[in-house]
Design a protein with these regions (language model features):
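Acceptor/aglycone-binding surface of glycosyltransferases and processive sugar-polymer synthases
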Residues: 1-4, 9-11, 21-100, 127-146, ...
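The conserved acidic donor/metal-binding loop of glycosyltransferases
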Residues: 14-18
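Catalytic donor-sugar/metal-binding loop of nucleotide-sugar-dependent glycosyltransferases
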Residues: 74, 95-98, 108-125
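Cell-envelope/extracellular polymer assembly enzymes that use nucleotide-activated donors
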Residues: 105
Length: 165
């Protein structure tokens, strides 16, 4: 498993072509340096490259606000699937990773468990293939479901102060 000692750091990239491997070290370096346990590649820090549709940006902002409200952590690109983790974070996720809305729920769970979560600027491209799980006519329903999942997660995860779970 990725949580074994063989793999000290892990990288996740979506398979839809949005994530440019040229930015891999921007995402990995803060984990290598011990700054973060999980570093997320964010398209919204520099606001360059593909920024996604207006409605999706509104939804991402909403979820970002929910996460900040529920755990006090500010993350701009809460739906980014471009992330790096260290061994401790990966071991935690091996036991506690959400399957419904993994990107935003993982941020909330990691933050509540006392892990250091941060972002690094990347430039993303438009989706090269596949279909988004968020469709325009289902966006409101999706936002309600994710918001409720985050609230339920917050109620079920005990916040760790000054340490890791």
């Amino acid at each position: 498993s990725a949580a074994s000692d063989v793999y000290k750091r892990q990288v996740q990239m979506d398979g839809d072509g949005q994530h440019d491997p040229a930015y891999l070290m921007e995402v990995v370096q803060p984990v290598l340096d011990g700054v973060y346990d999980m570093c997320i590649g964010s398209r919204f820090i520099k606001k360059e490259g593909f920024q996604t549709s207006f409605m999706r940006r509104v939804g991402i902002r909403w979820l970002s606000g929910m996460i900040r409200l529920l755990c006090g952590k500010r993350v701009l690109d809460v739906t980014s699937g471009f992330r790096a983790t260290n061994l401790a974070m990966t071991a935690y996720f091996a036991q506690h990773y959400a399957t419904d809305y993994p990107e935003p729920e993982a941020i909330l769970a990691a933050s509540l468990a006392g892990f250091r979560v941060g972002e690094a600027p990347v430039i993303m491209r438009e989706r090269q293939g596949g279909v988004s799980s968020i469709h325009s006519f289902k966006s409101a329903y999706y936002m309600i479901k994710v918001s409720l999942a985050l609230i339920i997660d917050r109620l079920s995860i005990r916040k760790v102060k000054g340490g890791r779970a």
